[in-house]
C-alpha cells in the first residue's frame, strides 16, 4: 500500500502528457547466411546457438551444453522464420520468443546482456607503401581488401549484437589525419570527437610482397599473407569482444548484489515513464523498488542477478543513462537521465 501511495504521489509530481517510447532493437532476431546451413531445421538450430552467443556475450560452448543438459527444445522458442535477400545474399531470418526463453536461461544460470549494447569505434589505417595511407570510413570502399574488412566487421557486429563503427570523416578530419605532425595523435583526436563506449586503433601495413603486419590495439605476432588478413581480424575482434562483453557468473550458492541506483535529471512524467521503460530493458536487474524520490530525481533499490559489473556493462551502452559515479562505501550508483 505504501509503495502504491508513493507511485501516485510521484505521478502527480511529474504530471505531463503521455508519450510512447522508441521501439526496441531486434535483440531476439538472428540472420543466418544460406551457405551456413543445410536445411531449415539445421538453420533454426544454428540461429538459436547464435542467439545464445548474442545474449550471453560469450562464445563458450558451456552455455549450449547447459541447454542440452536441461533438455530444452530450441525449436520451441522460435516465433517465426523466413528467408530474405540482403544485397545479393539470401539469409534465413529467425525471430525467437524472448518472454519464454529468458526465464529458462535464468534457471540454468546463463548470464545475460540486455538491449543496451556498446558502440566500439574503430580507427583503421591501411598503409600499402605505394601511396599515402588511408583510413577506413563508413562510406563505401572501392578497394577490395578494405571492402572485405568492412564486411567482416559488419558480420561480426550482427553476430555479436554490438555496434562496430567506423568514423565518417569531414574535410577537417581528412586534413588533420593527412598532415605530417608528430605532435598530432589521430587516435586521441578521433576517440574524443566521435561517441564510443570502447575504442580500437588498428594499423594494417604492407611490409613485403604479399606480406602484411597489424599494429595498434590489435597486433599480429608474425607477417600475414593477404588471404590471412581477414581471418586474423575476425579472430582478433571476436577475442576483444569476448573480454568486453563477458558477464562472469556468480559462484555456486552466491546471491546477486544489491545496489542503490539514483537517477537524476527528470523533468516531467514522460521522463519518469522513459526511465521505467529503460530499466525494464536491463537484464542485470532482477527486481527494483522505489526508495526515495524528488521532483527531478528517483532512487531505486535494485536486486541484481549478478554483480554490479554486469549492470555497469549494460549501462555503458545505454542511450538514456550516463554513469556519473559509483560509491563503493554506500553501494550507490548515480546516473544522469539523458532527455
Predicted features along the sequence, with ranges:
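Extracytoplasmic
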Residues: 188-189, 305-328
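Bacterial N-terminal signal peptides
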Residues: 6-16
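N-terminal segment of the mature soluble domain
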Residues: 44-66, 118-181, 194, 275-301, ...
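Amphipathic beta-strand/beta-sheet edge segments enriched in Tyr/Trp
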Residues: 22-34, 100, 189-237, 331-339
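Signal peptide-directed extracytoplasmic domains
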Residues: 64-126, 131-135
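Sec/Tat signal peptide C-region and signal peptidase I cleavage site
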Residues: 17-21
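Short, surface-exposed ligand-recognition loops at beta-strand->loop->(often short) alpha-helix junctions
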Residues: 144, 262-271, 304-305
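A short, hydrophobic beta-strand-centered structural micro-motif
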Residues: 73-82, 123, 163-170, 177-211, ...
Amino acid at each position: 500500500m505504501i509503495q502504491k501511495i508513493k507511485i501516485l504521489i510521484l505521478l502527480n509530481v511529474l504530471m505531463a502528457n503521455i508519450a510512447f517510447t522508441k521501439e526496441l532493437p531486434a535483440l531476439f532476431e538472428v540472420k543466418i547466411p544460406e551457405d551456413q546451413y543445410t536445411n531449415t531445421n539445421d538453420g533454426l538450430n544454428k540461429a538459436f546457438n547464435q542467439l545464445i552467443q548474442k545474449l550471453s556475450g560469450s562464445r563458450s560452448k558451456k552455455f549450449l551444453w547447459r541447454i542440452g543438459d536441461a533438455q530444452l527444445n530450441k525449436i520451441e522458442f522460435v516465433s517465426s522464420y523466413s528467408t530474405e535477400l540482403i544485397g545479393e545474399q539470401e539469409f534465413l531470418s529467425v525471430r525467437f520468443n524472448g518472454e519464454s526463453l529468458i526465464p529458462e536461461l535464468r534457471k540454468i544460470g546463463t548470464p545475460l546482456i540486455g538491449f543496451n549494447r556498446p558502440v566500439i569505434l574503430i580507427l583503421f589505417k591501411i598503409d600499402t607503401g605505394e601511396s599515402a595511407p588511408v583510413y577506413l570510413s563508413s562510406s563505401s570502399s572501392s578497394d577490395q581488401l578494405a571492402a572485405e574488412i568492412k564486411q567482416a566487421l559488419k558480420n561480426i557486429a550482427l553476430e555479436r549484437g554490438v555496434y562496430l563503427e567506423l568514423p565518417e570523416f569531414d574535410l577537417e578530419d581528412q586534413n588533420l589525419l593527412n598532415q605530417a605532425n608528430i605532435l598530432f595523435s589521430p587516435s586521441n583526436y578521433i576517440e574524443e570527437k566521435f561517441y564510443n563506449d570502447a575504442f580500437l586503433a588498428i594499423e594494417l601495413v604492407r611490409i613485403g610482397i604479399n606480406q602484411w603486419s597489424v599494429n595498434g590495439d590489435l597486433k599480429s605476432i608474425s607477417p600475414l599473407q593477404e588471404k590471412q588478413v581477414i581471418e586474423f581480424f575476425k579472430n582478433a575482434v571476436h577475442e576483444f569482444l569476448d573480454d568486453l562483453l563477458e558477464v562472469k557468473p556468480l559462484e555456486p550458492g552466491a546471491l546477486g548484489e544489491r545496489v542503490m541506483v539514483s537517477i537524476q535529471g527528470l523533468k516531467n512524467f514522460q521522463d519518469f515513464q522513459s526511465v521505467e521503460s529503460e530499466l525494464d530493458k536491463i537484464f542485470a536487474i532482477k527486481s527494483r523498488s522505489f526508495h526515495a524520490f524528488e521532483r527531478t530525481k528517483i532512487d531505486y533499490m535494485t536486486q541484481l542477478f549478478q554483480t554490479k559489473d554486469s549492470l555497469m556493462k549494460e549501462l555503458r551502452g545505454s542511450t538514456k543513462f550516463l554513469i556519473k559515479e559509483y560509491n563503493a562505501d554506500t553501494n550507490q550508483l548515480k546516473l544522469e537521465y539523458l532527455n
